Swiss-Prot record:
UniProt-recorded name of the protein: Putative acyl-[acyl-carrier-protein] desaturase DesA2
Keyword Acetylation: yes
Annotated binding of Fe cation 2, by residue: E107, E159, E189, H192
The species this protein was found in: Mycobacterium tuberculosis (strain ATCC 25618 / H37Rv)
N-acetylalanine found at: A2
InterPro entries: Fatty_acid_desaturase-2, Ferritin-like_SF, RNR-like
Enzyme class, broadest EC rank: oxidoreductase
EC number: 1.14.19.-
Miscellaneous comment in the UniProt entry for this protein: Was identified as a high-confidence drug target.
Gene that produces this protein: desA2
Amino acid sequence: MAQKPVADALTLELEPVVEANMTRHLDTEDIWFAHDYVPFDQGENFAFLGGRDWDPSQSTLPRTITDACEILLILKDNLAGHHRELVEHFILEDWWGRWLGRWTAEEHLHAIALREYLVVTREVDPVANEDVRVQHVMKGYRAEKYTQVETLVYMAFYERCGAVFCRNLAAQIEEPILAGLIDRIARDEVRHEEFFANLVTHCLDYTRDETIAAIAARAADLDVLGADIEAYRDKLQNVADAGIFGKPQLRQLISDRITAWGLAGEPSLKQFVTG
């Protein structure tokens, strides 16, 4: 029989902070549904059900837009790895359990909506996309070497990456339904960043030196979204060249996040602050 995990000191210290932020998160939610952002009237069966299989001529959006959407989708597909790391670093009980479950559900909604839109509108090859999904999820995500504080810092940075990526992507999309969907995802990412960033803020009061060191470590190691998707090297370059998300955007968001924590003047963090 599996042993029930026991919360450690930091997990218990942050429990009331998680509760307060969870209450705020739910009180300010703006519920949305994947099916509202999928133009099902554009859909048709694939060959398996007597219709047509996908071919490149069916794509109508610019390549940079579909490349960015596929990167975003594959990242959302791999959220199970992030969920596992959060549970292993903290606990799936009480307010922690409620938050991690809620965060996972909201992130999964992004994957559901994106895949339904892209498959129904035939903007991407569903077979090729599925191959990459399986490959990337099997590769997994591991962060067992991160401390608990580093894990929270990473998540704050990661969610800010998602928000910037989606905002820049939405700004370049002319198709209104997809633009609206990406905007909704961006707004969720902003809320997720706020949650994790608030936990880091509390850590700065609770264990300041460790937290500053964690911020420096994660800032130094952070890469562009999708850098670990081996099959999408060309898509990553296209997205960077289009100004949606690349090294310049990454550097700026790291600087902005550190500044938002009030740490721009910290000696060990000055190298990450621009301007």
